[in-house]
Amino acid sequence: MLFLMTNVFDVFNSFCSDEGHLFMCGDNSFGQLGTGDNQSYNLPVEVLFFASKHVEQIACGMRHTLALVTGDLVYGFGSARHGQIGNSVSKPQKSCNLPEVIQGFGSCKIVGLFANGDHSAALTANGELYIWGRGFSGASNDLHPRLLHSSLRISQVTLGWHHAIVLADGEVYMLGGYRHRAVSGSHVVSPVRHQSVPSAPCTAVSDVRTLEKVSCLDGERVVQIAAGAEHSALLTERKDHDMGLGEHGQLGLGNTDDQTFPQIVNIPNWRSFASTLGIYCGSGFTVVTKSA
């Protein structure tokens, strides 16, 4: 059996095989392993709920898991305290140890699932973004997927503990923020407010979410984005930029200072292999890879 995809959080891991089988291990206090119990496992165990299904993608948050199966069905399991597994408003629950279908995507084809902290997101083939879970910047929680109403055609999404970053046509936009100001501050402007609207009836005006453009990259085209718990990384065609919390050295700047706007990271011989680089973030670290 060949494992094609893994998704790791601090205390639990998931593995998806080439045959669409899902295996999980680690902490299961909130049912985030989807095994129907709350027992933790120190070896991978198959999630039997999906035994007759084909799992295509997985995403792990702090205490919850999302799974996309063939047929464009999205499942959530684990902690539901902030709505991160898409539980119905009429059926509040603190956790769920068996996968449940998340409603609210209509006939959209889902091509990407994302999770971090208590946040969840799904990207459609048309570049539309749905978000749910803990509200950003003090907004109320979303207990069901909410469509981000925007003219942007989003191609990449990454989530932090308190912020989200999206990439559209080489430009970066931010949702939310936190005390270290991941990609915000005086260098962020919002010439167009891209609002989110609920995918199920909702009348609360205060629930409007907005994307803000990150405009401090001197016109450079961004090709990849990544987010850790409280920091972010942007890979342009010529440079790597990091910003946010720096207490563990995760910004790669030779210090542990926090940064409120993107800083260029010095990578030796950058220009000789810039087109083959990839960038990824863990909770408190950043990795730059070079492909063959």
Placement of each model-derived feature along the sequence:
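Structural signature of WD-repeat beta-propeller blades
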Residues: 4, 12, 45, 56, ...
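Loop/turn position at the start of each blade in beta-propeller repeats
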Residues: 9, 42, 53, 60-61, ...
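Loop/turn-rich, solvent-exposed surfaces of beta-rich toroidal or solenoidal domains
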Residues: 217-249
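WD40 beta-propeller repeat fold
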Residues: 1-42, 47-49, 57-59, 67, ...
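Conserved core positions of repeat-based scaffolds
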Residues: 12-15, 24, 64-67, 76, ...
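Short glycine/serine- and acidic-residue-enriched loop/turn motifs that recur at repeat junctions
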Residues: 1-2, 23, 27-42, 75-96, ...
